[in-house]
UniProtKB/Swiss-Prot annotation:
A motif (QWRF motif) lies at residues 468-471. One of its GO terms (cellular component) is microtubule. Pfam families: QWRF. Residues 90-102, 206-216, 291-303 have a biased composition (Polar residues). Residues 42-72, 345-359, 401-418 have a biased composition (Low complexity). PANTHER family: AUGMIN FAMILY MEMBER (PTHR31807), QWRF MOTIF-CONTAINING PROTEIN 2 (PTHR31807:SF32). This is QWRF motif-containing protein 2. Residues 1-125, 157-221, 291-317, 340-359, 371-429 are annotated as: Disordered.
């Protein structure tokens, strides 16, 4: 259920303002209880106090947790302390957490709570956290929209509320100037019931603690220096921006249509009662008007209240952020409509179709709040058109705590009425089954089983742990991605260098292969060089023989002199050649027949040549013999002559006388 009341501040969970250096004007703080008369709102006895009272609240920067005493009053007024870890934990007992408190930061509060005391203590931890821690805190603050579920009711029994005096020992907190209302005294009357939920107490040191996600809120924005109470209404107003033509439909669901954003936070339609009752109640939200003409620069902030049409649960909301302008006419119109809506005799409350009122507002972001069993976080992180600053996401426990405030916390006492329909809401809250969102207040009274509360608490813790791991995994994934990109870049460079080396190696291999082929060719030609050198000598004889062969062929084929132009009929030439071939074939038969005779003649001629050679030898021998015969004939003649002469000598001697 949406809590949209910012006219009064919950004394059990007061907001922590920023340091004086971080305020709007950077100087003196403005009083928190300043009453400004409205120029537009019509006077109404039911909410004359709340409609003309504005408070100046600031958003917080870091989350914190504080411990409380056994009484609920001390628990609700305890101071929060920053935690370095986004996943906060709470102490199990109130007594253990009280022992860890810092006396300097948590001074004793006197019995008079109406006295305004300047507080010089300011806790600023925005600069102590690193960027990674801030990112981690931011990542654990928002619940996913997948957590949306149907609302359900628990089989519990309402106990009659008793009235008791408020606890005297209250811890003072910075900038706390309002007294404890009567409606808070009813809750402070049963300190024993508050001992049932171990996570109700807060630890006051800087260790990692988990705030009670059912009753407290977290805000980890780095631009806020003080710690403040977490309410959905204030976070909604802090996240919402000014737009020209938005609309707010109030029909049991707060839907601020602000620019067509698709991120919504639903505060549920249906709060079911027990199965045997079979009754469902719808939540109706109303905006009470701001008493000033505009809300800007943190001066005076408007008030939002969300009243249930059936059970009337009301929880206060955070104030509007700075520089967000909202006309008082808008608040006046909204307030008047919702007073008529809550009036039993008005036609708006009688007809279900008129319960949805479209309101022209100046919000800039779209928010939808659902009162389902699982809380949702508002989609922050979007820059304001007025301030231009980023808004951080809300805590999961903040949405749960603000939407699960008990009916008694939101009920107004007779001495302090918030609006005209508070009595009707008190009656509704006493008679109707509370929502699943009323865990934090009802568990202090012991009205709801601890098993379901523990389940919801563990769900929130596990979801925060899941967000932490998701953040760690995302950071690891980013690191792995960077390493992967670097590795891919290195691999690419290595591949390029390897390709260049391969190209150079390929070129060198080609050159080596060519050199090997050249060497092989040289080795082959080296053996043939002698024959090639001899070929130059043989070429002349070969060319002369070829020229003689060509000339003989020409002489045998071309017997007619060809001079000048010669025209030859190819067909006639063909017939002539064919006839010549026929004649040659006929001659060849005769030539073959004569070849035998020629062979015989050739053999005879060979024999004749042999005989002739022999005759020649014999003739030469005869010539020698003839020459010798002639010489011998001459000798013979001389001899014959001598013989003749010798035969004639004696005759002559006888004839001559002896002397």
């Amino acid at each position: 259920m949406v809590a949209a009341a910012i006219s009064t501040t919950d004394p059990r969970n007061p907001p922590r303002d920023r340091p004086q250096s971080l305020t709007n004007n950077g100087g003196q703080r403005r009083p928190r209880g300043k009453q400004v008369p409205s120029r537009y709102l019509s006077p109404s006895p039911s909410h004359s106090v709340s409609s003309t009272t504005t408070t100046t609240t600031t958003t917080t920067t870091t989350t914190s947790s504080s411990s409380s005493s056994s009484s609920s009053a001390i628990l609700r007024t305890s101071k929060r302390y920053p935690s370095p870890s986004p996943l906060l934990s709470r102490s199990t007992t109130n007594s253990a957490s009280n022992s860890i408190k810092t006396p300097s930061l948590l001074p004793k509060r006197s019995q008079s709570v109406d006295r305004r005391r300047p507080s010089a203590v300011s806790v600023t931890v925005g600069t102590e956290m690193s960027a990674a821690t801030k990112m981690l805190i931011t990542s654990t603050r928002s619940l996913s929209v997948s957590f949306q579920g149907e609302a359900f009711s628990l089989p519990i029994s309402k106990k009659k509320e008793t009235t008791s005096t408020p606890v005297s020992h209250r811890k003072s907190t910075p900038e706390r100037r309002r007294s404890t209302p009567v409606r808070d005294q009813r809750e402070n009357s049963k300190p024993v019931d508050q001992q049932r939920w171990p996570g109700a107490s807060r630890r006051g040191n800087s260790e990692s603690v988990v705030p009670n996600s059912l009753s407290r809120s977290l805000d980890c924005g780095s631009d806020r220096g003080k710690l403040g109470s977490g309410f959905v209404g204030r976070s909604m107003l802090h996240n919402s921006m000014i737009d020209e033509s938005p609309r707010v439909s109030v029909n049991g669901r707060l839907s601020l249509d602000l620019g067509g954003r698709d991120e919504y936070l639903d505060i549920g339609d249906d709060i079911q009662r027990r199965p045997n009752n079979g009754l469902t109640s719808s939540v109706s939200c109303d905006f009470t008007a701001s008493d000033t003409d505009s809300v800007s620069s943190g001066s005076t902030n408007g008030v939002q209240e969300c009243g249930s049409g059936v059970n009337g649960e009301i929880s206060k909301s955070k104030s509007l952020p700075r520089n967000i302008m909202a006309s008082a006419r808008f608040w006046q119109e909204t307030n008047s409509r919702l007073r008529r809506l809550q009036d039993p005799g008005s036609p708006l409350s009688s007809s279900p179709g008129l319960k949805t009122s479209s309101i022209s507002s100046k919000f800039g972001l779209s928010k939808r709040f659902s009162s389902d069993a699982v809380p949702l976080s508002s989609p922050r992180g979007m820059a304001s058109p007025v301030r231009g600053s980023a808004i951080r996401s809300a805590s999961p426990s903040k949405l749960w705590a603000t939407t699960t405030s008990s009916p008694a916390r939101a009920l107004s006492s007779p001495s302090r009425a918030r609006n005209g329909v508070s009595d009707q809401m008190n009656a509704y809250n006493r008679n109707n089954t509370p929502s699943i969102l009323s865990f934090s207040a009802d568990i202090r009274r012991g009205k709801i089983g601890e098993d379901r509360v523990m389940d919801a608490h563990l769900l929130r813790l596990l979801y925060n742990r899941d967000l932490q791991w998701r953040f760690v995994n995302a950071r690891a994934d980013s690191t792995v991605m960077v390493q992967r990109l670097n590795a891919e870049k290195n691999l690419w460079n290595a591949w390029v260098s390897i390709s260049e080396l391969r190209h150079s190696v390929t070129l060198k291999r080609i050159k080596l292969l060519l050199l090997r082929q050249k060497l092989k060719l040289a080795s082959i030609l080296r053996g043939q060089m002698g024959f090639l050198e001899e070929w130059s000598l043989l070429d002349r004889d070969h060319s002369s023989s070829l020229s003689g062969a060509t000339e003989s062929l020409k002489a045998s084929t071309l017997r007619l002199p060809i001079v000048g132009k010669t025209v030859v009929d190819i067909q006639d030439l063909k017939h002539a050649v064919s006839s010549a071939v026929d004649v040659m074939q006929a001659m060849s038969s005769s030539i073959f027949s004569l070849t035998s005779k020629v062979d015989e003649m050739n053999s005879v001629m060979v024999e004749t040549v042999n005989v002739t050679a022999k005759e020649k030898v014999l003739l030469e021998r005869c010539q020698g013999c003839l020459s010798r015969v002639a010489a011998m004939q001459v000798t013979d003649c001389s001899m014959k002559t001598h013989i003749i002469q010798l035969s004639r000598i004696p005759i002559t001697s006888s004839l001559t006388p002896q002397l």
